[in-house]
Amino acid sequence: TPEMLGTLFEELITGRHEQGAYYTPAYVVSYMSKESIKRYLGANGILLSKDLIGTIDASNPYTGDAQQILELLKNVKIIDPACGSGAYLVGFVNEIMRLYCTLSPDADSHSIFAFKKHCVSKCIFGVDLEEYAVQIAQLRLWLSLISQAVDPMPLPHIDLNIVVGDSISGPNPGKHYLWPADQKSAL
């Protein structure tokens, strides 16, 4: 599973604390994903009670404009500037998909896969210093996507969204991190 791959990577990497590499526990990833979505929706006019995001499910359906939330989720952009093995990125996709499936109870497997593919290829971005960590993050997102594939179909170019770089201190901390021109145009 994508989670197992991340755990394995986190356990095998040596010297991570010397490099400032720390990995986020699953319960923190879940909380951060829900909070991020709640704040994003709130900034776009959808005010939800404190715990509503976490409690929207089949037994507690959302009674507002589900289509408006789905459209916002389709257009969200999330970046993890120190993504490591991609725990937050995968957690965010999982939370978006949990909400999508709850708000679209009649969605068929093709629609679910198409929405997830869109999220992975258009909404999720990450940067990390370690090439191996970036490769694991990409693989985790691909595995997450493949796990719901109904027909063999081309996978998105996640390698354009998850890149090796230093987005925190970079060569010049006064400048914003810029995606390479060839990758930026592909997005």
Name these PLM-found stretches.
Residues 1-12:
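Long recognition/docking surfaces used for binding and targeting
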Residues 14, 18-187:
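SAM-dependent methyltransferase catalytic region
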